[in-house]
Amino acid sequence: MTLLPKKPCKSKAKGLLLGALFTSFLLLLYSYVVPPLYPNMAFTTSEAAAPCSPIPNEPVAATPANGSAGGCQPRRDIVFMKTHKTASSTLLNILFRFGQKHELKFAFPNGRNDFHYPSYFARSLVQDYRPGACFNIICNHMRFHYEEVRGLVRPGATFITVIRDPARLFESSFHYFGSVVPLTWKLSSRDKLAEFLQDPDRYYDPSSYNAHYLRNLLFFDLGYDSSLDPASPRVQEHILEVERRFHLVLLQEYFDESLVLLRELLCWDLEDVLYFKLNARRDSPVPRLSGELYRRATAWNLLDVRLYRHFNASFWRKVEAFGRERMAREVAELRQANEHMRHICIDGGQAVGAEAIQDSAMQPWQPLGIKSILGYNLKKSIGPQHEQLCRRMLTPEIQYLSDLGANLWVTKLWKFLRDFLRW
Protein backbone atom coordinates (compact mmCIF):
# COMPACT_ATOMS: atom_id res chain seq x y z
CA MET A 1 0.00 0.00 0.00
CA THR A 2 1.46 3.33 -1.08
CA LEU A 3 1.47 6.00 1.61
CA LEU A 4 0.60 9.52 0.56
CA PRO A 5 3.25 12.07 1.58
CA LYS A 6 2.25 14.20 4.54
CA LYS A 7 1.45 17.80 3.77
CA PRO A 8 4.12 20.07 5.18
CA CYS A 9 1.57 22.12 7.17
CA LYS A 10 3.88 22.65 10.09
CA SER A 11 6.69 23.86 7.82
CA LYS A 12 4.35 26.30 6.08
CA ALA A 13 3.06 27.58 9.39
CA LYS A 14 6.60 28.12 10.63
CA GLY A 15 7.49 29.90 7.41
CA LEU A 16 4.49 32.20 7.69
CA LEU A 17 5.27 32.94 11.32
CA LEU A 18 8.91 33.72 10.55
CA GLY A 19 7.86 35.86 7.62
CA ALA A 20 5.41 37.81 9.77
CA LEU A 21 8.02 38.34 12.49
CA PHE A 22 10.64 39.42 9.97
CA THR A 23 8.21 41.83 8.30
CA SER A 24 7.30 43.30 11.68
CA PHE A 25 10.99 43.75 12.44
CA LEU A 26 11.54 45.54 9.13
CA LEU A 27 8.61 47.87 9.77
CA LEU A 28 9.89 48.63 13.25
CA LEU A 29 13.37 49.32 11.91
CA TYR A 30 11.99 51.44 9.10
CA SER A 31 9.95 53.53 11.53
CA TYR A 32 13.19 54.23 13.39
CA VAL A 33 15.38 54.81 10.36
CA VAL A 34 13.00 57.11 8.46
CA PRO A 35 12.10 60.19 10.49
CA PRO A 36 8.85 62.17 10.26
CA LEU A 37 8.74 64.71 7.47
CA TYR A 38 7.80 67.80 9.46
CA PRO A 39 9.22 67.69 12.97
CA ASN A 40 9.88 70.79 15.03
CA MET A 41 12.40 73.11 13.42
CA ALA A 42 15.14 72.22 15.92
CA PHE A 43 15.69 69.19 18.09
CA THR A 44 18.58 70.57 20.11
CA THR A 45 17.67 71.57 23.65
CA SER A 46 18.61 75.03 24.89
CA GLU A 47 21.19 73.49 27.23
CA ALA A 48 22.88 71.69 24.33
CA ALA A 49 22.70 74.65 21.93
CA ALA A 50 25.97 76.25 23.02
CA PRO A 51 27.74 77.77 20.00
CA CYS A 52 31.03 76.45 18.69
CA SER A 53 33.85 77.53 21.02
CA PRO A 54 37.24 77.38 19.27
CA ILE A 55 40.30 76.56 21.33
CA PRO A 56 42.15 79.83 22.10
CA ASN A 57 44.89 80.62 19.57
CA GLU A 58 43.87 77.63 17.44
CA PRO A 59 45.02 78.34 13.85
CA VAL A 60 42.26 78.46 11.25
CA ALA A 61 44.67 77.61 8.43
CA ALA A 62 48.19 76.38 8.88
CA THR A 63 49.82 76.26 5.49
CA PRO A 64 49.62 78.54 2.46
CA ALA A 65 48.43 77.06 -0.81
CA ASN A 66 51.32 76.41 -3.17
CA GLY A 67 51.53 79.13 -5.75
CA SER A 68 48.36 80.82 -4.52
CA ALA A 69 48.03 84.47 -5.43
CA GLY A 70 48.83 86.91 -2.66
CA GLY A 71 49.95 84.14 -0.31
CA CYS A 72 46.35 83.43 0.77
CA GLN A 73 45.67 80.77 3.36
CA PRO A 74 43.60 77.69 2.43
CA ARG A 75 40.19 77.70 4.07
CA ARG A 76 39.51 74.66 6.22
CA ASP A 77 36.14 75.44 7.79
CA ILE A 78 33.48 74.52 5.24
CA VAL A 79 29.75 73.83 5.26
CA PHE A 80 28.58 72.06 2.12
CA MET A 81 24.81 71.93 1.84
CA LYS A 82 24.60 68.65 -0.09
CA THR A 83 21.59 68.82 -2.38
CA HIS A 84 20.16 65.75 -4.13
CA LYS A 85 20.98 64.68 -7.71
CA THR A 86 23.30 67.61 -8.43
CA ALA A 87 26.76 65.96 -8.70
CA SER A 88 27.00 66.56 -4.96
CA SER A 89 28.56 63.12 -4.35
CA THR A 90 31.48 64.12 -6.56
CA LEU A 91 31.97 67.32 -4.57
CA LEU A 92 31.63 65.34 -1.35
CA ASN A 93 34.60 63.18 -2.38
CA ILE A 94 36.66 66.34 -2.90
CA LEU A 95 35.85 67.50 0.63
CA PHE A 96 36.52 64.06 2.12
CA ARG A 97 39.97 63.99 0.52
CA PHE A 98 40.88 67.50 1.65
CA GLY A 99 39.70 66.87 5.20
CA GLN A 100 41.55 63.56 5.39
CA LYS A 101 44.73 65.05 3.94
CA HIS A 102 44.77 67.84 6.55
CA GLU A 103 43.36 65.77 9.44
CA LEU A 104 40.32 68.00 9.83
CA LYS A 105 37.33 67.30 12.04
CA PHE A 106 34.15 66.22 10.24
CA ALA A 107 30.65 66.51 11.66
CA PHE A 108 29.21 63.12 10.68
CA PRO A 109 25.65 61.83 11.17
CA ASN A 110 25.21 59.29 13.95
CA GLY A 111 24.40 55.82 12.59
CA ARG A 112 23.48 56.86 9.05
CA ASN A 113 24.95 58.60 6.03
CA ASP A 114 22.54 61.55 6.34
CA PHE A 115 21.34 63.77 9.17
CA HIS A 116 17.94 62.06 9.48
CA TYR A 117 16.77 63.55 6.19
CA PRO A 118 14.04 64.69 5.48
CA SER A 119 13.91 66.07 9.01
CA TYR A 120 15.49 69.44 9.63
CA PHE A 121 19.13 69.37 10.69
CA ALA A 122 19.87 69.60 14.40
CA ARG A 123 23.33 69.61 15.92
CA SER A 124 22.25 66.89 18.35
CA LEU A 125 22.23 64.52 15.34
CA VAL A 126 26.00 64.83 14.95
CA GLN A 127 28.10 61.85 15.97
CA ASP A 128 29.87 62.47 19.31
CA TYR A 129 28.42 65.98 19.61
CA ARG A 130 29.10 67.87 22.81
CA PRO A 131 27.89 71.43 23.56
CA GLY A 132 30.47 73.92 22.34
CA ALA A 133 32.16 71.45 19.98
CA CYS A 134 33.65 72.90 16.78
CA PHE A 135 33.90 71.08 13.46
CA ASN A 136 35.83 71.91 10.30
CA ILE A 137 33.62 70.27 7.67
CA ILE A 138 29.89 69.51 7.51
CA CYS A 139 28.92 67.90 4.22
CA ASN A 140 26.35 65.06 4.47
CA HIS A 141 22.76 65.20 3.23
CA MET A 142 20.44 67.21 5.46
CA ARG A 143 17.44 69.46 5.34
CA PHE A 144 19.15 72.75 5.98
CA HIS A 145 18.67 74.63 9.24
CA TYR A 146 21.03 77.60 9.24
CA GLU A 147 21.09 78.39 12.96
CA GLU A 148 21.75 74.78 13.93
CA VAL A 149 24.54 74.39 11.37
CA ARG A 150 26.03 77.77 12.25
CA GLY A 151 26.47 76.69 15.85
CA LEU A 152 28.92 73.95 14.86
CA VAL A 153 31.50 75.96 12.91
CA ARG A 154 33.74 78.97 13.46
CA PRO A 155 32.54 82.45 12.47
CA GLY A 156 34.71 82.49 9.33
CA ALA A 157 33.38 79.22 7.87
CA THR A 158 32.65 79.10 4.13
CA PHE A 159 29.14 78.00 3.08
CA ILE A 160 28.68 76.41 -0.34
CA THR A 161 26.03 74.41 -2.18
CA VAL A 162 25.30 73.17 -5.71
CA ILE A 163 22.14 73.42 -7.82
CA ARG A 164 20.97 72.13 -11.18
CA ASP A 165 18.48 72.84 -13.97
CA PRO A 166 15.22 71.99 -12.13
CA ALA A 167 13.70 69.99 -14.99
CA ARG A 168 16.81 67.79 -15.24
CA LEU A 169 16.97 67.46 -11.46
CA PHE A 170 13.30 66.42 -11.38
CA GLU A 171 13.95 63.78 -14.04
CA SER A 172 16.92 62.34 -12.15
CA SER A 173 15.10 62.39 -8.82
CA PHE A 174 12.02 60.73 -10.31
CA HIS A 175 14.07 57.85 -11.72
CA TYR A 176 16.26 57.43 -8.62
CA PHE A 177 13.66 57.82 -5.86
CA GLY A 178 10.48 56.84 -7.70
CA SER A 179 10.36 53.34 -6.22
CA VAL A 180 10.18 54.77 -2.67
CA VAL A 181 7.51 57.37 -3.48
CA PRO A 182 4.18 55.50 -3.18
CA LEU A 183 2.24 58.01 -5.26
CA THR A 184 4.17 56.78 -8.33
CA TRP A 185 3.02 53.19 -7.82
CA LYS A 186 -0.34 53.93 -9.43
CA LEU A 187 1.38 54.96 -12.67
CA SER A 188 0.99 52.09 -15.14
CA SER A 189 2.85 53.36 -18.21
CA ARG A 190 6.33 52.12 -19.14
CA ASP A 191 7.39 55.77 -19.08
CA LYS A 192 6.02 56.71 -15.67
CA LEU A 193 7.66 60.12 -15.70
CA ALA A 194 5.91 61.11 -18.92
CA GLU A 195 2.59 59.83 -17.57
CA PHE A 196 3.06 61.81 -14.36
CA LEU A 197 3.88 65.04 -16.21
CA GLN A 198 0.75 64.79 -18.36
CA ASP A 199 -1.32 65.62 -15.28
CA PRO A 200 0.87 65.94 -12.14
CA ASP A 201 -1.90 67.43 -9.99
CA ARG A 202 -3.89 64.23 -10.49
CA TYR A 203 -1.18 62.12 -8.84
CA TYR A 204 0.70 64.47 -6.55
CA ASP A 205 -0.16 64.90 -2.89
CA PRO A 206 2.34 67.04 -0.93
CA SER A 207 1.49 65.17 2.27
CA SER A 208 2.17 61.78 0.68
CA TYR A 209 5.19 59.82 1.89
CA ASN A 210 8.45 60.99 0.22
CA ALA A 211 6.51 63.33 -2.07
CA HIS A 212 9.14 66.02 -1.50
CA TYR A 213 11.42 64.20 -3.95
CA LEU A 214 9.08 65.03 -6.82
CA ARG A 215 8.62 68.80 -6.61
CA ASN A 216 10.95 71.73 -5.92
CA LEU A 217 13.54 69.49 -4.29
CA LEU A 218 16.18 72.23 -4.13
CA PHE A 219 13.84 74.52 -2.20
CA PHE A 220 12.99 71.67 0.15
CA ASP A 221 16.62 70.68 0.78
CA LEU A 222 17.51 74.29 1.56
CA GLY A 223 14.92 74.23 4.33
CA TYR A 224 12.00 76.04 2.74
CA ASP A 225 8.38 75.18 2.02
CA SER A 226 8.39 73.49 -1.38
CA SER A 227 4.63 73.97 -1.85
CA LEU A 228 4.67 77.79 -1.73
CA ASP A 229 2.80 79.73 -4.40
CA PRO A 230 5.53 80.73 -6.91
CA ALA A 231 4.09 84.27 -6.91
CA SER A 232 4.44 84.63 -3.14
CA PRO A 233 6.89 87.35 -2.02
CA ARG A 234 8.31 84.79 0.41
CA VAL A 235 9.93 82.98 -2.52
CA GLN A 236 12.16 85.93 -3.38
CA GLU A 237 12.86 86.52 0.32
CA HIS A 238 14.08 82.94 0.65
CA ILE A 239 16.26 83.24 -2.46
CA LEU A 240 17.91 86.40 -1.13
CA GLU A 241 18.42 84.66 2.20
CA VAL A 242 20.30 81.86 0.43
CA GLU A 243 22.43 84.51 -1.30
CA ARG A 244 23.31 86.11 2.04
CA ARG A 245 24.19 82.82 3.71
CA PHE A 246 26.17 81.05 0.98
CA HIS A 247 29.51 82.28 -0.31
CA LEU A 248 29.22 80.27 -3.52
CA VAL A 249 26.40 78.42 -5.26
CA LEU A 250 27.87 76.02 -7.81
CA LEU A 251 26.10 74.96 -11.02
CA GLN A 252 26.09 71.27 -11.89
CA GLU A 253 25.97 72.02 -15.63
CA TYR A 254 29.17 74.07 -15.32
CA PHE A 255 30.91 71.89 -12.79
CA ASP A 256 34.47 72.58 -13.92
CA GLU A 257 33.91 76.34 -13.95
CA SER A 258 32.32 75.99 -10.52
CA LEU A 259 35.37 74.15 -9.18
CA VAL A 260 37.67 76.86 -10.51
CA LEU A 261 35.65 79.46 -8.59
CA LEU A 262 35.60 77.20 -5.53
CA ARG A 263 39.36 76.70 -5.69
CA GLU A 264 39.82 80.47 -5.84
CA LEU A 265 37.43 81.02 -2.93
CA LEU A 266 39.05 78.38 -0.72
CA CYS A 267 42.64 79.07 -1.83
CA TRP A 268 43.26 75.38 -2.57
CA ASP A 269 45.75 73.58 -4.80
CA LEU A 270 44.74 72.11 -8.15
CA GLU A 271 45.18 68.58 -6.79
CA ASP A 272 42.58 69.33 -4.12
CA VAL A 273 39.80 69.77 -6.70
CA LEU A 274 40.62 66.90 -9.07
CA TYR A 275 37.70 64.51 -9.45
CA PHE A 276 36.06 61.57 -11.16
CA LYS A 277 32.32 61.69 -11.68
CA LEU A 278 30.73 59.64 -8.88
CA ASN A 279 27.21 58.27 -8.42
CA ALA A 280 26.37 58.76 -12.09
CA ARG A 281 23.29 56.97 -13.41
CA ARG A 282 23.39 54.45 -16.27
CA ASP A 283 21.59 55.67 -19.38
CA SER A 284 17.88 54.97 -18.98
CA PRO A 285 15.98 52.95 -21.61
CA VAL A 286 13.35 55.71 -21.36
CA PRO A 287 14.25 58.76 -23.48
CA ARG A 288 15.44 61.88 -21.67
CA LEU A 289 13.14 64.84 -21.19
CA SER A 290 12.79 66.95 -24.30
CA GLY A 291 10.41 69.43 -25.86
CA GLU A 292 7.01 69.46 -24.22
CA LEU A 293 7.97 67.19 -21.31
CA TYR A 294 10.91 69.44 -20.45
CA ARG A 295 8.57 72.44 -20.42
CA ARG A 296 6.10 70.58 -18.22
CA ALA A 297 8.84 69.57 -15.78
CA THR A 298 10.01 73.17 -15.63
CA ALA A 299 6.48 74.45 -14.97
CA TRP A 300 6.02 71.82 -12.25
CA ASN A 301 9.10 73.05 -10.36
CA LEU A 302 8.71 76.82 -10.51
CA LEU A 303 10.18 77.53 -7.08
CA ASP A 304 13.38 75.77 -8.07
CA VAL A 305 13.27 77.55 -11.43
CA ARG A 306 13.26 80.95 -9.73
CA LEU A 307 16.10 79.86 -7.46
CA TYR A 308 18.12 78.48 -10.38
CA ARG A 309 17.66 81.54 -12.58
CA HIS A 310 18.79 83.84 -9.78
CA PHE A 311 21.98 81.91 -9.06
CA ASN A 312 22.69 81.16 -12.71
CA ALA A 313 22.84 84.93 -13.25
CA SER A 314 25.01 85.54 -10.17
CA PHE A 315 27.31 82.67 -11.19
CA TRP A 316 28.14 84.28 -14.51
CA ARG A 317 28.73 87.62 -12.83
CA LYS A 318 31.34 85.84 -10.70
CA VAL A 319 32.87 84.36 -13.86
CA GLU A 320 33.08 87.83 -15.42
CA ALA A 321 34.76 89.18 -12.29
CA PHE A 322 37.18 86.22 -12.34
CA GLY A 323 37.96 86.85 -16.02
CA ARG A 324 36.69 84.85 -19.00
CA GLU A 325 40.13 84.14 -20.44
CA ARG A 326 41.54 83.16 -17.07
CA MET A 327 38.54 80.90 -16.51
CA ALA A 328 39.08 79.17 -19.86
CA ARG A 329 42.76 78.56 -19.04
CA GLU A 330 42.06 77.15 -15.57
CA VAL A 331 39.19 74.95 -16.78
CA ALA A 332 41.51 73.52 -19.45
CA GLU A 333 44.18 72.93 -16.81
CA LEU A 334 41.69 71.13 -14.54
CA ARG A 335 40.38 68.94 -17.35
CA GLN A 336 43.90 68.03 -18.47
CA ALA A 337 44.83 67.05 -14.91
CA ASN A 338 41.62 64.99 -14.55
CA GLU A 339 42.34 63.21 -17.82
CA HIS A 340 45.87 62.47 -16.65
CA MET A 341 44.53 60.90 -13.45
CA ARG A 342 41.94 58.91 -15.41
CA HIS A 343 44.70 57.18 -17.39
CA ILE A 344 46.65 56.49 -14.20
CA CYS A 345 43.79 55.29 -11.97
CA ILE A 346 40.88 53.76 -13.87
CA ASP A 347 40.95 50.26 -15.32
CA GLY A 348 39.48 50.53 -18.80
CA GLY A 349 39.42 54.30 -18.53
CA GLN A 350 35.71 54.67 -17.84
CA ALA A 351 32.84 53.96 -15.45
CA VAL A 352 31.17 50.53 -15.56
CA GLY A 353 27.91 48.98 -14.40
CA ALA A 354 27.55 47.51 -10.92
CA GLU A 355 27.82 43.95 -12.26
CA ALA A 356 31.28 44.70 -13.71
CA ILE A 357 32.80 46.19 -10.55
CA GLN A 358 35.35 43.71 -9.22
CA ASP A 359 36.08 45.15 -5.76
CA SER A 360 33.18 45.47 -3.30
CA ALA A 361 34.99 48.46 -1.77
CA MET A 362 34.30 50.28 -5.05
CA GLN A 363 30.61 49.31 -5.27
CA PRO A 364 28.36 52.40 -5.00
CA TRP A 365 25.03 52.46 -3.16
CA GLN A 366 22.17 51.52 -5.48
CA PRO A 367 18.52 52.65 -5.53
CA LEU A 368 15.88 50.11 -4.51
CA GLY A 369 15.06 47.52 -7.13
CA ILE A 370 17.60 48.44 -9.79
CA LYS A 371 21.37 48.67 -10.10
CA SER A 372 21.55 51.83 -12.17
CA ILE A 373 24.50 53.63 -10.56
CA LEU A 374 27.88 53.31 -12.25
CA GLY A 375 31.23 52.77 -10.54
CA TYR A 376 34.87 52.10 -11.33
CA ASN A 377 37.56 49.47 -11.25
CA LEU A 378 40.89 50.60 -9.86
CA LYS A 379 43.93 49.72 -11.96
CA LYS A 380 46.00 46.98 -10.37
CA SER A 381 49.39 48.46 -11.29
CA ILE A 382 49.53 52.02 -9.98
CA GLY A 383 52.79 53.56 -8.86
CA PRO A 384 53.23 54.44 -5.18
CA GLN A 385 53.12 58.15 -6.03
CA HIS A 386 49.47 57.93 -7.12
CA GLU A 387 48.07 54.80 -5.47
CA GLN A 388 46.56 56.50 -2.42
CA LEU A 389 45.10 59.42 -4.37
CA CYS A 390 43.59 57.11 -7.00
CA ARG A 391 41.88 54.95 -4.39
CA ARG A 392 40.50 57.95 -2.53
CA MET A 393 39.21 59.59 -5.72
CA LEU A 394 37.33 56.41 -6.67
CA THR A 395 35.98 55.39 -3.25
CA PRO A 396 32.15 55.70 -3.04
CA GLU A 397 30.51 57.76 -0.31
CA ILE A 398 29.47 55.00 2.12
CA GLN A 399 32.85 53.29 2.10
CA TYR A 400 34.69 56.61 2.43
CA LEU A 401 32.53 57.59 5.41
CA SER A 402 33.50 54.33 7.10
CA ASP A 403 37.18 54.95 6.33
CA LEU A 404 36.89 58.37 7.99
CA GLY A 405 35.37 56.90 11.14
CA ALA A 406 31.66 57.57 10.67
CA ASN A 407 29.29 55.28 12.58
CA LEU A 408 27.01 53.80 9.91
CA TRP A 409 25.35 50.91 11.74
CA VAL A 410 21.84 51.76 10.50
CA THR A 411 22.99 52.18 6.89
CA LYS A 412 24.99 48.94 7.03
CA LEU A 413 22.10 47.01 8.56
CA TRP A 414 19.78 48.35 5.89
CA LYS A 415 22.25 47.28 3.19
CA PHE A 416 22.48 43.80 4.72
CA LEU A 417 18.69 43.43 4.68
CA ARG A 418 18.48 44.72 1.10
CA ASP A 419 21.16 42.25 -0.03
CA PHE A 420 19.43 39.43 1.85
CA LEU A 421 16.07 40.21 0.25
CA ARG A 422 17.71 41.06 -3.12
CA TRP A 423 16.12 44.52 -3.23
From Swiss-Prot:
Q: Which branch of life, at top level?
A: Eukaryota
Q: Which GO terms describe its cellular component?
A: Golgi membrane; membrane
| Segment forming the signal sequence | none
After gene disruption, what is the outcome? Mice homozygous for a null mutation of the CST gene born healthy and display hindlimb weakness from week 6 of age and subsequently show a prenounced tremor and progressive ataxia. Myelin vacuolation is observed in the cerebellar white matter, diencephalon, brainstem and spinal anterior column. Male mice were infertile due to a blocked spermatogenesis.
Which EC class does it fall in?
A: transferase
Reported EC number(s) for this entry are 2.8.2.11
Q: What is its main location?
A: Golgi
UniProt keyword Transferase, yes or no: yes
Q: Which residues lie on this side of the membrane: Cytoplasmic?
A: 1-12
Residues with attached carbohydrate: N66, N312
Tell me which parts of the chain lie in the Lumenal compartment.
36-423
Residues spanning the membrane? 13-35
Q: According to its UniProt record, in which tissues is this protein expressed?
A: Expressed in brain, testis, kidney, stomach, small intestine, liver, and lung. Not detected in heart, skeletal muscle, and spleen.
What are the GO MF terms of this UniProt record? galactosylceramide sulfotransferase activity
GO biological process terms, semicolon-separated: galactosylceramide biosynthetic process; galactosylceramide metabolic process; glycerolipid metabolic process; glycolipid biosynthetic process; myelination; spermatogenesis
The annotated pathway is: Lipid metabolism; sphingolipid metabolism
Q: Which reaction does it catalyse?
A: a beta-D-galactosyl-(1<->1')-N-acylsphing-4-enine + 3'-phosphoadenylyl sulfate = an N-acyl-1-beta-D-(3-O-sulfo)-galactosyl-sphing-4-enine + adenosine 3',5'-bisphosphate + H(+); a 1-O-alkyl-2-acyl-3-O-(beta-D-galactosyl)-sn-glycerol + 3'-phosphoadenylyl sulfate = a 1-O-alkyl-2-acyl-3-(beta-D-3-sulfogalactosyl)-sn-glycerol + adenosine 3',5'-bisphosphate + H(+); a beta-D-Gal-(1<->1')-ceramide + 3'-phosphoadenylyl sulfate = 1-(3-O-sulfo-beta-D-galactosyl)-ceramide + adenosine 3',5'-bisphosphate + H(+); a 1,2-diacyl-3-O-(beta-D-galactosyl)-sn-glycerol + 3'-phosphoadenylyl sulfate = 1,2-diacyl-3-(3-O-sulfo-beta-D-galactosyl)-sn-glycerol + adenosine 3',5'-bisphosphate + H(+)
Which keywords does this Swiss-Prot/TrEMBL entry list?
A: Glycoprotein, Golgi apparatus, Lipid metabolism, Membrane, Signal-anchor, Sphingolipid metabolism, Transferase, Transmembrane, Transmembrane helix
Localization annotation: Golgi apparatus membrane
| PANTHER family registered for this protein in UniProt | GALACTOSE-3-O-SULFOTRANSFERASE, GALACTOSYLCERAMIDE SULFOTRANSFERASE
Q: Which family does it belong to?
A: Belongs to the galactose-3-O-sulfotransferase family.
* Record function comment: Catalyzes the transfer of a sulfate group to position 3 of non-reducing beta-galactosyl residues in glycerolipids and sphingolipids, therefore participates in the biosynthesis of sulfoglycolipids. Catalyzes the synthesis of galactosylceramide sulfate (sulfatide), a major lipid component of the myelin sheath and of monogalactosylalkylacylglycerol sulfate (seminolipid), present in spermatocytes. Seems to prefer beta-glycosides at the non-reducing termini of sugar chains attached to a lipid moiety.
Question: What is the name listed in the Swiss-Prot or TrEMBL entry for this protein?
Answer: Galactosylceramide sulfotransferase
Organism in which the protein naturally occurs:
Mus musculus (Mouse)
What taxonomic lineage is listed for the species of origin?
A: Eukaryota, Metazoa, Chordata, Craniata, Vertebrata
